[in-house]
Amino acid sequence: MVDIVDKALRMGEGRQIKKLEHVAEAVNKLEDQMVVMSDDELKGQTAKFKERLANGETLDDLMPEAFATVREVSKRTLGQRHFDVQLMGGAALHWGNIAEMKTGEGKTLVATLPSYLNALEGKGVHVITVNDYLASYQSELMGRIYRFLGMSVGCIVTGQKPAERRKQYNADITYGTNNEFGFDYLRDNMAWEKNELVQRGHHYAIVDEVDSILIDEARTPLIISGPAEGDVTRWYRQFAKLVLKLNRDEDYEVDEKKKTVGILDPGITKIEDYLGIDNLYEPSNTALIGYLNNAIKAKELFLRDRDYVVTGGEVLIVDEHTGRILPGRRYNEGLHQAIEAKENVEVKAENQTFATITLQNYFRMYDKLAGMTGTAETEAAEFMGTYKLGVLPIPPNKPMIRIDQDDLIFRTKKEKLAAIVKDVAARHRKGQPVLLGTASVESSEVVSSLLDVVEIPHKVLNAKQHEKEAAVVAVAGRKGAVTVATNMAGRGTDIMLGGNVEFLADAELKAKGYSPDDTPEEYEKLWPETLKKIKEQVKDEHEEVKKLGGLYVLGTERHESRRIDNQLRGRSGRQGDPGESRFYLSLEDDLMRLFNTQLVARVMAKGMPEGEPIESKSVSKGVRNAQKAVESRNFEIRKNVLKYDDVMNKQRTVIYSERQAVLKGEDIHEDIEAFISDTLTSYVRGAKNGSDKPADWDWNGLFKAVNDLYPTKVTIDEAKEAAEGLKGDKAVDAVVKLFVDDAEAQYEAFETKLGADGLRTLERRVVLAVLDRKWREHLYEMDYLKDGIGLRGMGQRDPLVEYQREGYQMYNQMIEAIKEETVQLLFHIDLDSIAQTNDDGTDSIDDAAVDSAEIKMGDDVSEDDELNKGNLSEHEPEEAARIDNHADELETAENIAAVKEAAEEGERIPESGLLGPEPMSHAEGKVPARKRPKSEELKTPWSDGRTFPGTPKNAPCPCGSGRKYKMCHGQNEQ
């Protein structure tokens, strides 16, 4: 099926390439005109282009001249002239495509063309790279072109303060990593003041190594979190010790493919004996099951120096695709704590999610998106389906002459490693540079130790030495160099035969104290001479290495993805240079062991002589099939992550847009009045007890609720009198009007006390406080709903449909809770404590006093919430790496009706938010009719009044709702 889609996507490829060639021809015709321009004339082009845009011309109209201008400026500042294929790549990016350009084709330089062109609109261009170093390096180097043309350049890196970030985002072109851009978006939607915002919109983005960021990283949501309540450290430590006493396959089972574990009956008995409990599955022990499962996962599925490293007493995750450390990122749902307990380091507190978004949904916000990579064609269908991005293969500037040798396959890892060392030694003796690619930190260290034994000098580049990355890669193409590196995917720095000229020149100038940011004039003056000197030094060595066969890439095992294998191979043979690549495999490699067990068993049974490689088409085919199986599985996981996040994305879009409106000063006084009316209406309707006769209503319960909401002056007798002789909606309307008139009269007095501006400020601050608190609680509940939703499949119900339906109900309940709590807060704040008289005699509010009052009220209203505006900034935001495992949940024919029903309900969420003129519905319950589920679905799981004494607050509720106990039946204990 995927092959058919790929063919369909490629049908118009030839026409697109012709169109790109026409752009290159148009630019070439302008080159003579640009060459004779003075520097000042070239600098003046930017103002002319902006004027033409203002007069109605389009970016497409300006493209040939703008590209020709950038090309000429690049020649004068960097000494680099854009090739025709680079012009084609620039046009592809401008039109919102992925330009597939092989390694060494100068993708970084290509990005300058569409970046400059689109920056002319003044809305900002974002260039996304894979790490902070590349963001800084590229913004400095390519920034010389932009600054020459009067454009400002920014760079977002880890550790910058908000004021500095805002300055960088306000630049015409801003470089940074995907995580920095994504987290800034989330932080902006947690800001409390307008001047705390740093981003200014999402106009146009160019994503470098787009497959790494939008495909490989797509399974990991960006999550800003903070410590949750309770200290459960002892449980993690206790279970880390207990699982050491359990035996695999006897006490528990492990599925390495799906990364799941399951406790068996003998294991349950042992755990119950160790803990001194009668039944592990009693409601009061439910939380212990989570600790047990995480401890087993930490023991069996997450290995040190493969999945993580321990540095400075911290467990740091290693990116499985690039081999880089992911600082600040933590596994979610207690798994990271289980690993910390296993490694006997400090177990940090569990986290609660404050804000989250997937990279898929973040990048889909951009008005225009484009990307560059050397390997995108294998994922063309996914790029089109998820991001509406076409893939255009750009022809190389020079033919690729690298020789890709057949794989050598050995029976055991020991035999494979011996053959690798022998091959490297032979290449090193003649001076050919060698790059060894490994799949993990552990593998790289094993290979390094074997090279030490035979005294082959080499450099190691893995998660433990990532600071040296660019420097190591820049010299990996020199004569005799041997480099051992974890996955080279997305490394970003080209391996040039003889050495990377630009990098070496830049490093020499910086060593002398010159940089394009701090000393731009001196740097520019010294650059041509330094570059020329380095080129001369490298030139002879470059030719010598070419004669030796170029860079030899040796893969020590196949990766799960063919695309990442191709990226490793692609480090050799750049710009028409010679090169060679080969992969060494063994039947003990994880890929073969887990995904092609029958083939492995068949080959092993043949009894091959030790040390002899297997050359078999069936084995090579088996490797490809194993990779396809993993790729297919990972694609399903990504699709399901997106499906589930799309539910949250609709809700997040509404909440964040309305939050921004409040933050930026929108007058919400009428909305507050609507909150009062809506909440009181829901109270009165809730008191009806299903009867239209006022005599049957719960008047005492109604007045208790109303008095908790605001200090009403209406009496029960007055309310009964208003409803006398009326029934149904008319009776409700009469009582509601009585309460609303009373509440609004009291509320109007606030304006007299605080002044109009003071009250508007107070309204905004309270709405933000309540919205943030309720949104965090909502994320918390949605997380737990998703964790348990897979079990619905056992009842022949589609888990995704159930998640959509229940998430939709929970969203509506959150909206009503925000209204209710906002009104309650506003009426209970001590106005005397926040009012102040200004020097001119006018009234206003004391901001600090408001903060204090809000926090106090927030604690009163929501006891479970530990974080509020007062201390949120004290907690460093953390990104939790979580892979959602819903890939195996498939729709069945029986679910078609449910799918339609969920679509009808779930798709309407973006139409209904917190702010707006719509009055409260007269339907039964608290939820407006335009978004209210069926009445029987309004019953909450805890409405039966049950409690489960002894259940920990943060444990899953024994009722099976999927919520934590404190958010479910635990509420009945209050």
From Swiss-Prot:
State the needed cofactors, names only. Zn(2+)
Cofactor detail note: May bind 1 zinc ion per subunit.
What broad class describes the main subcellular location of this protein? membrane
What is the top EC class of this enzyme, as a single word? translocase
Q: Where in the cell is it found?
A: Cell membrane; Cytoplasm
Q: How does it sit in the membrane?
A: Peripheral membrane protein
Is-annotated flag, keyword ATP-binding?
yes
- Residues binding Zn(2+) are C957, C959, C968, H969
Example GO biological process term? protein import
- What reaction(s) does this enzyme catalyze? ATP + H2O + cellular proteinSide 1 = ADP + phosphate + cellular proteinSide 2
Q: Which residues bind ATP?
A: Q86, G104, E105, G106, K107, T108, D494
Pfam families from the UniProt entry: P-loop_SecA, SEC-C, SecA_DEAD, SecA_PP_bind, SecA_SW
Q: What keywords were assigned to this record?
A: ATP-binding, Cell membrane, Cytoplasm, Membrane, Metal-binding, Nucleotide-binding, Protein transport, Translocase, Translocation, Transport, Zinc
EC number in record: 7.4.2.8
Q: Which GO terms describe its cellular component?
A: cell envelope Sec protein transport complex; cytosol; plasma membrane
Please give the InterPro entries that the UniProt record associates with this protein.
Helicase_ATP-bd, Helicase_C-like, P-loop_NTPase, SEC_C_motif, SecA, SecA_CS, SecA_DEAD, SecA_motor_DEAD
According to the record, the residues making up region (Disordered) are 855-880, 902-974
Q: State one molecular function term (GO).
A: ATP binding
According to the UniProt entry, the coiled-coil residues are none
Annotated family: Belongs to the SecA family.
Describe its assembly. Answer: Monomer and homodimer. Part of the essential Sec protein translocation apparatus which comprises SecA, SecYEG and auxiliary proteins SecDF. Other proteins may also be involved.
Q: What HAMAP family does the entry give?
A: SecA
Function comment: Part of the Sec protein translocase complex. Interacts with the SecYEG preprotein conducting channel. Has a central role in coupling the hydrolysis of ATP to the transfer of proteins into and across the cell membrane, serving as an ATP-driven molecular motor driving the stepwise translocation of polypeptide chains across the membrane.
Q: Which PANTHER family match?
A: CHLOROPLAST PROTEIN-TRANSPORTING ATPASE, SECA INNER MEMBRANE COMPONENT OF SEC PROTEIN SECRETION SYSTEM
Protein name stated in the entry: Protein translocase subunit SecA
Query: Organism, per UniProt?
Result: Bifidobacterium animalis subsp. lactis (strain AD011)
List the lineage, top down: Bacteria, Bacillati, Actinomycetota, Actinomycetes, Bifidobacteriales
